[in-house]
Structure formats: C-alpha cells, structure tokens
C-alpha cells in the first residue's frame, strides 16, 4: 500500500473514531437528558400529588371544622332552649298566687283616677250616696251615684231591708252598677245588734256574752259561721263584727252583752273562733272597737267617751283579743272614737283620729297590715268637735284606710280630694290604703 493510501486510511479511521466518540457523547448526553427528564417528571408528579393531597387535607379540615361548628351551634341552641325551658319552669314555680294577687292589686289601683281613688276610701250608707230618704232598691239613681262617687263600700241597716228577695236584688244590682269591686256591709253581731235577722225574722244566734259564758270556742265559731252564711246568701261581704272589747266596766251599757266576757283570755279565744266562722263563709270580719271600748262609761254615739287605763293595763287586757283576731287573719279592724290619754301623751283625742294609736300601736306594735276603718264618723264624739272634712283628713293621716259614714259625705269627700291635690295627704298614702283594701276585694279572684 502506498504512503498516500496509508494516510487516507488513517484519516478515515480517525474520522470514524471521532464520529464514534461524538455519537457516544451524544448518547451519553441524551441518556442524561432523558434521565433528568424522568427525574423531573417524577418530582413534578410528586409535587402535584403533594399539592393535591394538601388541598384535599385542607378541604377535609375545613369540612370537619364546619361540622364541628355546626355541632357546637346546635348544642348551644339546645342548651339555650333547655335553659329557657328551665327558666320558664322556674318562673312558673316561683309565680305564686300571692304574686298574682299583688299584680292584680297594683294594676287596679294604677288604673284609677284620683277622684275614684278618694271615693274608694269611703264606706257610706246608700242614703248618703244617693240622697234619698230611705233606700230599699238600687236603680238608676244608685247607678248614676256610683259612677260619680265609686265609694269603697256601702253599709245597710234595718230600714233598708224589707224581704229576702228585695235584699238580694238590691245588693246584686248595687254590685253590678259599681265600676270597681265594692264592699257591702252590715252590723250583724247577734243578740241585740242583728239588723238582718231582726228585719227578716231569722233565728237570732243570741248575744255573744251567752256564748262566751260557755267557754266553748266552737260555739263562737258555729254562731258566726251561721251569721256569715246567711249574710253571704243575700250578697253581703263584710260584717262589722265581732266585738273584741273586754267588758271590764259592768256599767258600760253600750257594750254590755255584746262583748264575750270580762276576761281578756276568754274574749281572745272567742274572737278567734268568731273570725274563723265568719270568714269561712266568705264574709270579712271586722274586729271592734280598738283600742278597747269595754272600760268606758260614756257612749261615743252621744258624746265623748274616755278610758283612764294605762298602756300597761291595756296591753295585758284590751289588746289581747285584738292580737288574737289579727293572728287569726281578720280582714278589718274598726278603730273607735274613745280617747285614751295614756296612749296619746295625755291628749284627749278620739282614737280614730290618733296617729299614736292607729299607726304607733295597731300597725307597728300589734303588726296589723289589714284594713283599718273608723267607727261611724257621724257620732257625737267626733261631730261635736270636728267638721266632716277635717275629721276625715285627720283619720287618714293617722293611718286609717276607710272612713265610715262621715256626717257629711260630700264635704268629707271634697275635703280629702283637696288635701291630696295640695299635698296635705300624699297620693302614695292614698295608694297604700287602696292596696290594702283591694287585697281583700280581689283575693277570691285568685284560684
């Protein structure tokens, strides 16, 4: 082979070797690229998978959080509902008949005008209300009078009673004509003070002295339950009885056999039985005549009547039956017109006008929070010394809730109205009395 051919062969082999090397390098590079792509693809796939898993985890967490929140809200709603039911149940348990009565009383008093409130403090005869000479029926005149002066109560006497049918109709009509609940009262003690029994020829239960002499408290209960039953059947809801006076002065004719006894404890026991008997029949009892009329010689109907007994003596005797009647639940206490200087720092003032006696002793010492009513204000023990309006104002300021039979109803009413308007008597004081009155009037409306 010539030298030229050898060189050509050498260059060909070198070119081939270079090509082989180039192809090899290219193959290596290609393999590296392919491998890198594969790795990148796997990495990308991993990243995508991780993101997807993260997203799914986030969605799942959000869903679980939402479910938890919904559950919490539902639980809260249930607890709130249960709490409301529990509160309502507690409220229902705590809302007592006493609460219902208080609410009715508050609403009744709040709904009255001042004129109506003042009229509601008076307890008068039908003649005083209407101006007629003798009232034996309740018609248009009674209706108009009650619309003008819606008095708190009307008291009837023998002259007003002709027959059972007439009495029932008169009282039923009167009650229906009154805008507000009204007291319909009478003096029915038994014995010589029995307006209804005497007028209608009913069997008289007899004087309380006879019952007291037996020492039988059940007899006092039965007699007064009998009285209460027939009074209620005609439409009466107040009896100005029992007499709680202790007859310590045998010369005291105005009380006499109207009292159960001269022994304080006997009177106290009998009074408790009498109160229970009357009020079991639905008729309010009225203890009388505070602070005690049993020791006086005078008659407050015709003039001044006075007792010289000391506070200590009265506390041990006269007050005992009143305490007993109050503890038994008497709806009313009547304050008499006797003067008791030992109770009023020597002042000779009718008890019915004395703040020391009504507020200081009856209210505060004896703890009485029921209705305090004066004895009839047309008695000489009052009228000889005071005008009707002055006496009514004094009684209310002293602590009385109701004024019984003022000498001049119109004068007394106008006087009290003016006293409230000018601040001599506060409206709060009037409201306090009306609330005590309406607690009794509305009590039976609470089941």
Briefly describe each language-model feature range:
Residues 2-184, 188-195:
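N-terminal hydrophobic targeting/anchoring segments and the immediately downstream early-domain regions
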Residues 181-188, 240, 428, 433:
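Short beta-strand elements of ligand-binding domains
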Residues 123, 155, 239-240, 286, ...:
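Conserved beta-strand positions in the central sheet of alpha/beta enzyme cores
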Residues 182-224:
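Substrate-binding cleft of extracellular glycoside hydrolase catalytic domains
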Residues 90-95, 105, 128-133, 153-162, ...:
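Second-shell loop/turn segments in exported
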Residues 206-275, 279:
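A substrate-binding/cap region within the structured catalytic cores of diverse enzymes
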Residues 113, 133-134, 138, 163-176, ...:
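Second-shell residues forming the walls of enzyme active-site clefts
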